[in-house]
Regions:
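Juxtamembrane transmembrane-helix termini in multi-pass membrane transport proteins
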Residues: 2-75, 139-157
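Alpha-helical membrane-protein architecture signal
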Residues: 5, 9, 13, 113-125
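Selective transmembrane alpha-helices of multi-pass membrane proteins
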Residues: 68-102, 160, 164-172, 183-213
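Membrane helix-loop-helix hairpins that form the core translocation module of multi-pass transporters
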Residues: 39-119, 205
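Hydrophobic/aromatic residues within the transmembrane alpha-helices of Major Facilitator Superfamily
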Residues: 16, 20, 53-54, 90, ...
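Alpha-helical transmembrane segments and their lipid-water interface positions
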Residues: 25, 51, 55-63, 85-88, ...
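Short, conserved phosphate/pyrophosphate- and ester-handling motifs at nucleotide-, phospho-/glycolipid
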Residues: 23, 130, 197
Length: 213
């Protein structure tokens, strides 16, 4: 039992460090928070957490090893992810325009608010179409988790990481949708949208150029 807690602690630390690092998931939650508000951002965060479950499932079922050993599968997935991030980047750049900065700006909808399903799907696709995330778990589990650890325990690890991811990005959503914080950001929203659009395009280019190591 003690070894399980050791594994759990190591997995948690490595995963939280990875989740807290700026990346496409963080950029997407920031975009959703500023453009659409808390509800949309939190549902996007839940979609990202669900994406983690997909990557963990790949690792537990051995599909991740197939991806790791198949340049063709890796290439197909990375280009799908790159095209999605590029599309998001272009949409973000197109939405960049000056907006009013008065107190009413927080309540004003600057764009049609996505449905719950659309917000969740956005988060899920942002995470699920990133093959680097799958390779992260494929590399992490064999190093940290003993092969003798029961599959049920490993599933528990995966569920925890999905919940922790959703909780982290939900917290980010709450922080960036505080009225004072959101007002401050919205004063410069057209510049932030432009910057985020460029960031998404940069992530798309980086993913498209990624190689198996």
């Amino acid at each position: 039992m003690q070894s399980y807690w050791t594994e759990f602690g190591a997995l948690t630390l490595a995963h939280l460090l990875a989740v807290a690092s700026p990346g496409p998931d963080f950029a997407m939650v920031l975009r959703q928070s500023l453009a659409h508000g808390r509800r949309t951002a939190i549902w996007t965060s839940l979609g990202i957490g669900t994406g983690i479950l997909l990557h963990v499932s790949y690792s537990l079922l051995g599909i991740g090893l197939v991806l790791q050993g198949s340049p063709t599968a890796f290439t197909v997935l990375k280009y799908a992810g790159a095209m999605y991030l590029a599309w998001v980047g272009v949409q973000t750049l197109r939405s960049a325009r000056p907006r009013a900065a008065g107190p009413e700006v927080v309540a004003e909808k600057t764009a049609p608010e996505p449905s719950t399903r659309a917000a969740w799907t956005t988060g899920f696709l942002t995470n699920a179409l990133n093959p680097k995330a799958t390779l992260f778990f494929v590399a992490l589990f064999p190093v940290v988790v003993n092969p003798a650890t029961p599959r049920s325990v490993q599933v528990g690890y995966g569920l925890w990481m999905a919940l922790a991811t959703a909780a982290w990005f939900s917290l980010v959503s709450v922080v960036f949708t505080q009225p004072a914080t959101r007002r401050a950001f919205l004063r410069w929203s057209h510049w932030i949208d432009r910057a985020l659009g460029v960031v998404f395009l940069g992530f798309a280019a980086g993913l498209a150029l990624a190689t198996l190591r």
